[in-house]
Protein backbone atom coordinates (compact mmCIF):
# COMPACT_ATOMS: atom_id res chain seq x y z
CA UNK A 1 0.00 0.00 0.00
CA UNK A 2 1.30 3.41 -0.93
CA UNK A 3 2.00 6.20 1.54
CA UNK A 4 -0.05 9.17 0.32
CA UNK A 5 0.76 11.77 3.00
CA UNK A 6 3.12 13.61 0.62
CA UNK A 7 3.53 14.03 -3.10
CA UNK A 8 4.93 10.95 -4.77
CA UNK A 9 7.86 11.57 -7.08
CA UNK A 10 7.55 9.92 -10.48
CA UNK A 11 10.41 9.15 -12.86
CA UNK A 12 9.02 8.82 -16.37
CA UNK A 13 11.26 6.82 -18.69
CA UNK A 14 10.09 7.97 -22.10
CA UNK A 15 8.15 11.11 -21.17
CA UNK A 16 7.81 12.35 -24.77
CA UNK A 17 6.14 9.19 -26.08
CA UNK A 18 2.42 8.49 -26.16
CA UNK A 19 2.28 6.87 -22.69
CA UNK A 20 4.67 9.42 -21.20
CA UNK A 21 2.58 12.36 -22.40
CA UNK A 22 -0.61 10.81 -21.04
CA UNK A 23 1.14 10.10 -17.72
CA UNK A 24 2.09 13.77 -17.51
CA UNK A 25 -1.56 14.64 -18.03
CA UNK A 26 -2.45 12.37 -15.08
CA UNK A 27 0.17 14.20 -12.98
CA UNK A 28 -1.12 17.57 -14.22
CA UNK A 29 -4.63 16.62 -13.06
CA UNK A 30 -3.39 15.27 -9.71
CA UNK A 31 -0.56 17.67 -8.93
CA UNK A 32 -1.43 17.60 -5.25
CA UNK A 33 -0.51 13.89 -5.20
CA UNK A 34 2.25 13.42 -7.80
CA UNK A 35 5.27 15.31 -9.09
CA UNK A 36 7.18 14.67 -12.32
CA UNK A 37 10.59 14.24 -10.69
CA UNK A 38 12.58 12.88 -13.64
CA UNK A 39 11.76 13.11 -17.35
CA UNK A 40 13.64 11.28 -20.10
CA UNK A 41 13.62 11.16 -23.88
CA UNK A 42 15.69 9.61 -26.64
CA UNK A 43 15.63 12.12 -29.52
CA UNK A 44 12.68 14.45 -28.86
CA UNK A 45 14.77 17.25 -27.37
CA UNK A 46 12.35 20.10 -28.10
CA UNK A 47 9.45 18.26 -26.47
CA UNK A 48 11.58 17.29 -23.46
CA UNK A 49 12.58 20.95 -23.01
CA UNK A 50 8.94 22.01 -23.19
CA UNK A 51 7.91 19.38 -20.61
CA UNK A 52 10.78 20.34 -18.31
CA UNK A 53 9.77 24.00 -18.39
CA UNK A 54 6.19 23.11 -17.45
CA UNK A 55 6.80 20.44 -14.80
CA UNK A 56 10.14 21.66 -13.34
CA UNK A 57 11.58 18.18 -12.63
CA UNK A 58 14.68 17.56 -10.56
CA UNK A 59 16.46 16.16 -13.62
CA UNK A 60 16.05 15.31 -17.29
CA UNK A 61 17.92 12.77 -19.41
CA UNK A 62 18.34 12.94 -23.17
CA UNK A 63 19.54 9.45 -24.15
CA UNK A 64 20.95 10.57 -27.50
CA UNK A 65 24.04 12.52 -26.47
CA UNK A 66 23.98 14.59 -29.67
CA UNK A 67 21.15 16.65 -28.15
CA UNK A 68 22.83 17.23 -24.77
CA UNK A 69 24.14 20.77 -25.38
CA UNK A 70 20.83 21.89 -26.87
CA UNK A 71 18.84 20.65 -23.85
CA UNK A 72 21.38 21.94 -21.31
CA UNK A 73 21.43 25.40 -22.91
CA UNK A 74 17.64 25.61 -23.17
CA UNK A 75 17.23 24.82 -19.46
CA UNK A 76 20.22 26.83 -18.20
CA UNK A 77 17.96 29.36 -16.47
CA UNK A 78 16.28 26.63 -14.40
CA UNK A 79 17.67 24.54 -11.50
CA UNK A 80 17.17 21.31 -13.48
CA UNK A 81 20.00 18.78 -13.78
CA UNK A 82 20.59 17.66 -17.37
CA UNK A 83 22.16 14.28 -18.14
CA UNK A 84 22.80 12.42 -21.38
CA UNK A 85 23.41 8.87 -22.57
CA UNK A 86 21.79 5.46 -21.95
CA UNK A 87 23.77 4.87 -18.74
CA UNK A 88 22.24 8.00 -17.21
CA UNK A 89 18.80 6.39 -17.54
CA UNK A 90 20.00 3.60 -15.26
CA UNK A 91 21.49 6.08 -12.79
CA UNK A 92 18.61 8.54 -12.34
CA UNK A 93 16.03 5.88 -11.41
CA UNK A 94 18.07 4.98 -8.33
CA UNK A 95 17.67 8.49 -6.82
CA UNK A 96 16.48 8.03 -3.23
CA UNK A 97 13.69 10.59 -3.75
CA UNK A 98 12.08 8.64 -6.60
CA UNK A 99 8.97 6.75 -5.48
CA UNK A 100 7.49 5.47 -8.75
CA UNK A 101 9.27 4.57 -11.98
CA UNK A 102 7.04 4.55 -15.06
CA UNK A 103 8.71 2.42 -17.72
CA UNK A 104 7.22 3.82 -20.91
CA UNK A 105 10.21 3.71 -23.24
CA UNK A 106 9.66 1.77 -26.45
CA UNK A 107 11.52 -1.46 -27.12
CA UNK A 108 14.59 -3.26 -25.75
CA UNK A 109 16.07 0.05 -24.55
CA UNK A 110 13.72 -0.06 -21.55
CA UNK A 111 15.24 -3.23 -20.09
CA UNK A 112 18.40 -1.97 -18.34
CA UNK A 113 16.77 1.08 -16.67
CA UNK A 114 13.92 -1.13 -15.43
CA UNK A 115 16.39 -3.59 -13.91
CA UNK A 116 18.21 -0.69 -12.21
CA UNK A 117 14.94 0.61 -10.79
CA UNK A 118 13.98 -2.83 -9.46
CA UNK A 119 17.39 -3.31 -7.82
CA UNK A 120 16.94 0.11 -6.19
CA UNK A 121 13.62 -1.08 -4.72
CA UNK A 122 11.40 1.29 -6.69
CA UNK A 123 7.67 0.82 -7.26
CA UNK A 124 7.38 -0.07 -10.97
CA UNK A 125 4.53 1.00 -13.24
CA UNK A 126 5.35 -0.95 -16.39
CA UNK A 127 4.20 0.08 -19.84
CA UNK A 128 7.32 -1.17 -21.65
CA UNK A 129 6.09 -4.65 -22.52
CA UNK A 130 9.36 -5.57 -24.24
CA UNK A 131 11.06 -5.72 -20.81
CA UNK A 132 8.93 -8.73 -19.85
CA UNK A 133 8.99 -10.19 -23.38
CA UNK A 134 12.79 -10.20 -23.47
CA UNK A 135 13.58 -11.02 -19.85
CA UNK A 136 10.36 -12.01 -18.09
CA UNK A 137 11.87 -14.77 -15.97
CA UNK A 138 14.80 -12.59 -14.86
CA UNK A 139 12.59 -9.56 -14.13
CA UNK A 140 10.16 -11.65 -12.10
CA UNK A 141 12.99 -13.12 -10.01
CA UNK A 142 14.57 -9.69 -9.43
CA UNK A 143 11.22 -8.19 -8.40
CA UNK A 144 10.73 -11.07 -5.96
CA UNK A 145 14.26 -10.75 -4.54
CA UNK A 146 13.93 -6.98 -4.03
CA UNK A 147 10.28 -7.04 -2.85
CA UNK A 148 9.27 -4.73 -5.70
CA UNK A 149 5.68 -4.55 -6.98
CA UNK A 150 5.23 -4.38 -10.76
CA UNK A 151 1.94 -2.74 -11.70
CA UNK A 152 0.89 -3.20 -15.33
CA UNK A 153 0.03 -0.10 -17.35
CA UNK A 154 -1.06 -1.85 -20.56
CA UNK A 155 -4.85 -1.51 -20.62
CA UNK A 156 -5.34 -5.27 -21.03
CA UNK A 157 -3.00 -6.27 -18.22
CA UNK A 158 -4.37 -3.56 -15.96
CA UNK A 159 -7.83 -5.00 -16.64
CA UNK A 160 -6.69 -8.52 -15.79
CA UNK A 161 -4.98 -7.26 -12.62
CA UNK A 162 -8.20 -5.53 -11.55
CA UNK A 163 -10.21 -8.74 -12.14
CA UNK A 164 -7.98 -11.05 -10.10
CA UNK A 165 -9.16 -12.40 -6.75
CA UNK A 166 -6.51 -13.34 -4.17
CA UNK A 167 -6.76 -17.02 -3.34
CA UNK A 168 -8.95 -17.90 -6.33
CA UNK A 169 -6.89 -19.56 -9.08
CA UNK A 170 -7.33 -18.41 -12.67
CA UNK A 171 -8.51 -21.01 -15.17
CA UNK A 172 -8.09 -18.80 -18.22
CA UNK A 173 -7.15 -15.25 -19.17
CA UNK A 174 -9.19 -13.80 -22.03
CA UNK A 175 -6.94 -11.15 -23.57
CA UNK A 176 -8.89 -8.82 -25.81
CA UNK A 177 -7.56 -7.36 -29.07
CA UNK A 178 -9.06 -4.80 -31.42
CA UNK A 179 -7.91 -6.97 -34.32
CA UNK A 180 -6.16 -4.04 -35.94
CA UNK A 181 -7.16 -2.17 -39.10
CA UNK A 182 -6.83 -5.24 -41.38
CA UNK A 183 -9.05 -7.62 -39.45
CA UNK A 184 -11.37 -8.15 -42.42
CA UNK A 185 -8.74 -8.02 -45.16
CA UNK A 186 -8.18 -11.02 -47.43
CA UNK A 187 -4.65 -12.50 -47.66
CA UNK A 188 -4.32 -10.76 -51.04
CA UNK A 189 -5.27 -7.39 -49.55
CA UNK A 190 -2.93 -7.86 -46.58
CA UNK A 191 -0.01 -8.49 -48.95
CA UNK A 192 -0.36 -4.98 -50.42
CA UNK A 193 -0.86 -3.03 -47.17
CA UNK A 194 1.11 0.23 -46.94
CA UNK A 195 2.67 1.85 -43.88
CA UNK A 196 0.13 4.70 -44.05
CA UNK A 197 -2.73 2.21 -43.88
CA UNK A 198 -1.06 0.37 -41.00
CA UNK A 199 -0.46 3.58 -39.04
CA UNK A 200 -4.19 4.36 -38.96
CA UNK A 201 -5.24 2.37 -35.86
CA UNK A 202 -9.01 2.22 -35.37
CA UNK A 203 -9.22 2.59 -31.58
CA UNK A 204 -6.17 3.64 -29.61
CA UNK A 205 -3.89 6.67 -29.79
CA UNK A 206 -0.38 5.20 -29.83
CA UNK A 207 3.13 5.74 -31.16
CA UNK A 208 4.19 4.56 -34.63
CA UNK A 209 6.05 1.42 -33.53
CA UNK A 210 3.24 -0.01 -31.40
CA UNK A 211 0.64 0.94 -34.03
CA UNK A 212 2.44 -1.24 -36.59
CA UNK A 213 2.78 -4.01 -33.97
CA UNK A 214 -0.99 -3.79 -33.45
CA UNK A 215 -1.61 -4.11 -37.18
CA UNK A 216 0.50 -7.30 -37.38
CA UNK A 217 -0.90 -8.60 -34.03
CA UNK A 218 2.68 -8.87 -32.76
CA UNK A 219 1.66 -6.40 -30.07
CA UNK A 220 -0.95 -8.89 -28.91
CA UNK A 221 1.62 -11.68 -29.09
CA UNK A 222 3.90 -9.67 -26.82
CA UNK A 223 0.98 -9.08 -24.45
CA UNK A 224 0.47 -12.86 -24.25
CA UNK A 225 4.11 -13.25 -23.17
CA UNK A 226 3.74 -10.34 -20.74
CA UNK A 227 0.62 -11.93 -19.22
CA UNK A 228 2.45 -15.21 -18.65
CA UNK A 229 5.06 -13.49 -16.46
CA UNK A 230 2.76 -11.01 -14.73
CA UNK A 231 0.10 -13.54 -13.78
CA UNK A 232 2.01 -16.84 -13.60
CA UNK A 233 -0.08 -18.73 -16.16
CA UNK A 234 0.84 -21.12 -18.98
CA UNK A 235 0.52 -20.19 -22.69
CA UNK A 236 -2.48 -22.53 -22.93
CA UNK A 237 -4.29 -20.51 -20.25
CA UNK A 238 -4.13 -17.31 -22.33
CA UNK A 239 -6.74 -16.95 -25.04
CA UNK A 240 -6.74 -13.96 -27.38
CA UNK A 241 -10.24 -12.68 -28.16
CA UNK A 242 -10.73 -10.18 -30.98
CA UNK A 243 -13.11 -7.49 -29.71
CA UNK A 244 -13.11 -4.61 -32.22
CA UNK A 245 -14.97 -2.12 -30.01
CA UNK A 246 -12.23 -2.19 -27.30
CA UNK A 247 -14.80 -1.61 -24.56
CA UNK A 248 -13.98 -4.80 -22.64
CA UNK A 249 -10.27 -4.45 -21.89
CA UNK A 250 -9.80 -8.09 -20.85
CA UNK A 251 -11.42 -10.85 -18.82
CA UNK A 252 -10.53 -13.52 -16.29
CA UNK A 253 -12.26 -16.90 -16.07
CA UNK A 254 -12.08 -18.68 -12.71
CA UNK A 255 -12.16 -22.38 -11.86
CA UNK A 256 -15.91 -22.33 -11.23
CA UNK A 257 -16.57 -20.97 -14.72
CA UNK A 258 -17.36 -17.40 -13.64
CA UNK A 259 -15.92 -14.67 -15.86
CA UNK A 260 -14.99 -11.16 -14.65
CA UNK A 261 -14.40 -8.36 -17.13
CA UNK A 262 -13.10 -4.82 -16.81
CA UNK A 263 -14.80 -2.28 -19.07
CA UNK A 264 -14.19 1.36 -19.83
CA UNK A 265 -13.59 3.92 -22.52
CA UNK A 266 -10.36 3.39 -24.48
CA UNK A 267 -8.28 5.95 -22.57
CA UNK A 268 -4.75 5.03 -21.46
CA UNK A 269 -4.82 7.64 -18.70
CA UNK A 270 -7.08 5.37 -16.64
CA UNK A 271 -4.66 2.41 -16.34
CA UNK A 272 -1.76 4.84 -15.86
CA UNK A 273 -3.58 6.59 -13.01
CA UNK A 274 -4.60 3.26 -11.46
CA UNK A 275 -0.99 2.03 -11.53
CA UNK A 276 0.07 5.22 -9.75
CA UNK A 277 -2.69 5.16 -7.13
CA UNK A 278 -3.13 1.40 -6.44
CA UNK A 279 -4.71 0.12 -4.25
CA UNK A 280 -6.78 3.32 -4.21
CA UNK A 281 -8.86 4.80 -7.02
CA UNK A 282 -8.70 8.51 -7.68
CA UNK A 283 -11.63 10.62 -8.80
CA UNK A 284 -11.30 11.67 -12.43
CA UNK A 285 -13.23 13.53 -15.10
CA UNK A 286 -12.29 11.03 -17.82
CA UNK A 287 -15.10 10.18 -20.24
CA UNK A 288 -17.58 7.68 -18.80
CA UNK A 289 -18.87 4.57 -20.53
CA UNK A 290 -22.48 5.07 -21.62
CA UNK A 291 -24.10 1.65 -21.98
CA UNK A 292 -27.08 3.13 -23.79
CA UNK A 293 -24.83 4.52 -26.50
CA UNK A 294 -22.96 1.24 -27.00
CA UNK A 295 -23.44 -0.55 -30.26
CA UNK A 296 -23.15 -4.32 -30.38
CA UNK A 297 -20.14 -5.82 -28.63
CA UNK A 298 -18.66 -8.51 -30.86
CA UNK A 299 -16.06 -11.23 -30.34
CA UNK A 300 -14.05 -13.30 -32.83
CA UNK A 301 -11.18 -15.76 -32.86
CA UNK A 302 -7.91 -14.28 -34.14
CA UNK A 303 -6.73 -15.61 -37.51
CA UNK A 304 -3.17 -16.79 -36.91
CA UNK A 305 -2.81 -17.82 -40.56
CA UNK A 306 -3.33 -14.29 -41.86
CA UNK A 307 -1.52 -12.75 -38.89
CA UNK A 308 1.48 -15.02 -38.40
CA UNK A 309 3.14 -12.79 -35.81
CA UNK A 310 0.67 -13.88 -33.14
CA UNK A 311 1.49 -17.54 -33.77
CA UNK A 312 5.24 -16.78 -33.71
CA UNK A 313 4.90 -15.08 -30.31
CA UNK A 314 3.08 -18.12 -28.87
CA UNK A 315 5.78 -20.37 -30.36
CA UNK A 316 8.53 -18.25 -28.78
CA UNK A 317 6.79 -18.37 -25.40
CA UNK A 318 6.47 -22.16 -25.56
CA UNK A 319 10.14 -22.56 -26.51
CA UNK A 320 11.20 -20.23 -23.72
CA UNK A 321 14.84 -19.38 -23.11
CA UNK A 322 16.03 -16.46 -25.21
CA UNK A 323 13.55 -17.10 -28.05
CA UNK A 324 11.20 -14.23 -27.05
CA UNK A 325 14.29 -11.97 -26.99
CA UNK A 326 15.12 -13.11 -30.55
CA UNK A 327 11.57 -12.39 -31.69
CA UNK A 328 11.56 -8.96 -30.07
CA UNK A 329 14.88 -7.93 -31.64
CA UNK A 330 13.85 -9.12 -35.10
CA UNK A 331 10.49 -7.40 -34.73
CA UNK A 332 12.08 -4.06 -33.82
CA UNK A 333 14.20 -4.28 -36.98
CA UNK A 334 11.38 -5.28 -39.36
CA UNK A 335 8.93 -2.83 -37.82
CA UNK A 336 11.30 0.05 -38.60
CA UNK A 337 12.13 -1.38 -42.03
CA UNK A 338 8.42 -1.49 -42.90
CA UNK A 339 7.97 2.12 -41.76
CA UNK A 340 10.93 3.03 -44.01
CA UNK A 341 9.31 1.25 -47.01
CA UNK A 342 12.18 -1.26 -47.16
CA UNK A 343 9.95 -4.36 -46.83
CA UNK A 344 6.33 -5.34 -47.40
CA UNK A 345 3.76 -6.16 -44.70
CA UNK A 346 4.04 -9.95 -45.11
CA UNK A 347 7.83 -9.75 -44.94
CA UNK A 348 7.50 -8.75 -41.27
CA UNK A 349 6.48 -12.22 -40.09
CA UNK A 350 8.71 -13.95 -42.65
CA UNK A 351 11.91 -12.24 -41.49
CA UNK A 352 11.04 -12.81 -37.82
CA UNK A 353 10.45 -16.53 -38.43
CA UNK A 354 13.73 -16.91 -40.32
CA UNK A 355 15.59 -15.07 -37.56
CA UNK A 356 14.09 -17.47 -35.00
CA UNK A 357 15.53 -20.37 -37.02
CA UNK A 358 18.99 -18.84 -37.47
CA UNK A 359 19.78 -17.21 -34.11
CA UNK A 360 21.56 -19.17 -31.38
CA UNK A 361 19.10 -20.55 -28.81
CA UNK A 362 19.99 -20.76 -25.12
CA UNK A 363 18.14 -21.26 -21.86
CA UNK A 364 20.63 -19.16 -19.91
CA UNK A 365 19.11 -16.03 -18.41
CA UNK A 366 21.21 -12.99 -17.67
CA UNK A 367 21.33 -9.43 -18.89
CA UNK A 368 24.54 -10.30 -20.78
CA UNK A 369 22.82 -13.15 -22.64
CA UNK A 370 19.89 -10.91 -23.56
CA UNK A 371 22.21 -8.14 -24.80
CA UNK A 372 24.17 -10.62 -26.95
CA UNK A 373 20.99 -12.25 -28.25
CA UNK A 374 19.48 -8.88 -29.09
CA UNK A 375 22.56 -7.82 -31.07
CA UNK A 376 22.79 -11.13 -32.96
CA UNK A 377 19.09 -11.27 -33.84
CA UNK A 378 19.16 -7.66 -35.09
CA UNK A 379 22.16 -8.44 -37.31
CA UNK A 380 20.47 -11.54 -38.76
CA UNK A 381 17.22 -9.68 -39.42
CA UNK A 382 19.07 -6.83 -41.16
CA UNK A 383 20.92 -9.35 -43.35
CA UNK A 384 17.65 -11.04 -44.30
CA UNK A 385 16.09 -7.69 -45.22
CA UNK A 386 19.11 -6.78 -47.36
CA UNK A 387 18.83 -9.97 -49.44
Describe every region a protein language model picked out:
Residues 1-387:
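Catalytic, metal-anchored helix/loop core of enzyme active sites in primary metabolism
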Amino acid sequence: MQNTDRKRNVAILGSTGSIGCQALDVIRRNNDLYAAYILTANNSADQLIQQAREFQPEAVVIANEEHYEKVKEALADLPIKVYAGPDSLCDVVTDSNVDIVLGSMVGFAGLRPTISAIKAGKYIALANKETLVVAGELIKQLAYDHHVPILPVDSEHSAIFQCLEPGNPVEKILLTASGGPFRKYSPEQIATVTKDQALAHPTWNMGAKITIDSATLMNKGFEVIEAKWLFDVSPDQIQVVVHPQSVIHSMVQFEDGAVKAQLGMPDMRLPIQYAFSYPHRLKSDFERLDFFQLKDLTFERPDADRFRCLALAYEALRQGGNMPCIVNAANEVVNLAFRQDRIGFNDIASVIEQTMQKAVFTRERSIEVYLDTDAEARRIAEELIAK
